[in-house]
Amino acid sequence: MTTNTVSRKVAWLRVVTLAIAAFIFNTTEFVPVGLLSDIAQSFQMETAQVGIMLTIYAWVVALMSLPFMLLTSQMERRKLLIGLFVLFIASHVLSFLAWNFNVLVISRIGIAFAHAIFWSITASLAIRLAPAGKRAQALSLLATGTALAMVLGLPIGRIVGQYFGWRTTFFAIGLGALITLLCLIKLLPKLPSEHSGSLKSLPLLFRRPALMSIYLLTVVVVTAHYTAYSYIEPFVQVVAGFSANFATVLLLILGGAGIIGSVLFGKLGNKHASLLVSSAIGLLLACLLLLMPAAQSETHLAILSIFWGVAIMIIGLGMQVKVLALAPDATDVAMSLFSGIFNIGIGAGALVGNQISLHLSMSAIGYLGAIPALAALIWSILIFRKWPVALEEQPHHG
């Protein structure tokens, strides 16, 4: 542990800067969801074809999270952060300039590489940089940065894209990253690598059936969500026939409802995590089934989005709590795996949505997304009954 000799103010500033970085990294992952139609238009492509960009990004992050974590495990953290930020910013400049769709995809792969390394080291960095005795708060700040990406990052990115073109959105994210990088260079001390967990802990984690079951649940439920969510923007405009502005409002509502979800989880998550997660999966299932019927009216879609946003936030937080509770001895590796598995789900959902939109009809994304959601609901009830107490959050000694 690096001895924390700096003032509390500086310690918090460091953590806040990391949280802002988390916000930026997650915004760029999700922002194409709000820009699909615009990108498709500028390259004369079908919206459904552009969606493959989400899958490529998510799967690169999923595949590279663990290898990158192991490759960089001995590197000094400050240098590593600066390096990955430079890659991140350069790739955004390339996105801004992308002269065809392939170049855009290549630039996104560069961003995904930076993303994979960033997520495998930030949680442990936030804990190290936090003021004494404030580890849990540091982690929750990081989680807030992540959550705000869905709540604010995506809709703001879409609004910028609507008024100034999607390229400007990517440029703005790159600019935000540059400012954050300058703050990190100024604020961060040298951070030699610590025991970040090595491959040795992998077999140990794979031998925990409860943890593996949570990972499986994560991938299935995330696939269900992203099957519909990836194409919500063209769905609102093409299938439901509402305006581009309403699509923006809907993304804001969906994200904003996540705040309600996180407050609910904060209040009830410690005691009733399992019940809360299963109920949220049931709620997600209902939202997906009702997506097409609700598309008759803007009000119905807006109300549905509130419940959908609450559900997905509770699911995401609940899974994280369970993973941390089941792997207190190897948090880096367990969270890196979690991030990888989450991204496999994002990529799979976006791919399923893409295939449905191309070969069936975009109006079916909700119904077909409901199939994995139903599987997830049944699976969650089974595993929470099998491992009831072990899965609730253990009191942390932070």
From Swiss-Prot:
One of its GO terms (molecular function) is carbohydrate transmembrane transporter activity. The keyword Membrane applies. The keyword Cell cycle does not apply. It is a multi-pass membrane protein. The chain crosses the membrane at residues 15-35, 50-70, 81-101, 103-123, 136-156, 169-189, 209-229, 246-266, 275-295, 301-321, 333-353, 364-384. One of its GO terms (cellular component) is plasma membrane. Keywords: Cell inner membrane, Cell membrane, Membrane, Sugar transport, Transmembrane, Transmembrane helix, Transport. Its main location: membrane. It is found in: Cell inner membrane. InterPro entries: MFS, MFS_dom, MFS_Efflux_Transporters, MFS_trans_sf, Sugar_effux_transptr_put. Involved in the efflux of sugars. The physiological role may be the reduction of the intracellular concentration of toxic sugars or sugar metabolites. Belongs to the major facilitator superfamily. SotB (TC 2.A.1.2) family. This is Probable sugar efflux transporter. It comes from Enterobacter sp. (strain 638). The lineage of its organism: Bacteria, Pseudomonadati, Pseudomonadota, Gammaproteobacteria, Enterobacterales. The gene is sotB.
